[in-house]
Amino acid sequence: MGKVKIKKKETRIDMTAMSDVTVLLLTFFMLTSTFLQKEPVQVITPPSVSEKKVPDSKLMSVLVAQDGKVYLELLGTKDSTLKSEDLREAVLKKAVAKYNATHTNKVNLTAKHVEAFRKSNAFGVPISNMTKWLDMPVDERDKALKTAGIPIEENFDLTRPTEFQIWVQAVYDALEDAGAADDMKKGTGIAIKADAGTPYERVQVVMNNL
């Protein structure tokens, strides 16, 4: 007697629902994640026990490299009051105007320079070299930052501000114009990120310049 052959049924797994869930999860993470911004130099901070979170808006971050070079990063408001790009543009124009008022070697910005600065996450070159830096391709700009830094020294005479103090005042004025300077007035809108190997004396100079 011959064996009865049982017809094998084709197994089919419907992945439609799983695909939908995957898309939803990817969308969620894209909308809620905070992407790490590229910094001009690597700054390895020392361990901290502070439970205070660094604000993610209306913030001026001061990066202090191990060799003492200083850079700035700016974040605007979360809403459309003063976006980060608009804040950078306003700060650049104000800083250059303040610099030109006390220096004979004037800096002349073009629309191209302003647009390039709007897209720059971090910056830190002498103002006199700003246009030259902004004229560089992005990858060359990144390399140039590593050997530059914002000029800063101990100074308590605000009638003759350091370039770092010019930038700080420009940031405050730009936020004040937008009605968003409260955090900076209270000090919560300023963050200093220094490398674990940065001499404390250098960090103290930065704090004294604020």
Residue ranges and their predicted role:
Residues K3-P40:
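Hydrophobic single transmembrane helices highlighted by the model
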Residues L36-L210:
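Long, low-hydrophobicity, acidic/polar, solvent-exposed interaction domains
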Residues M1-K9, S61-L63, N108:
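Short N-terminal signal/transit or membrane-insertion segments
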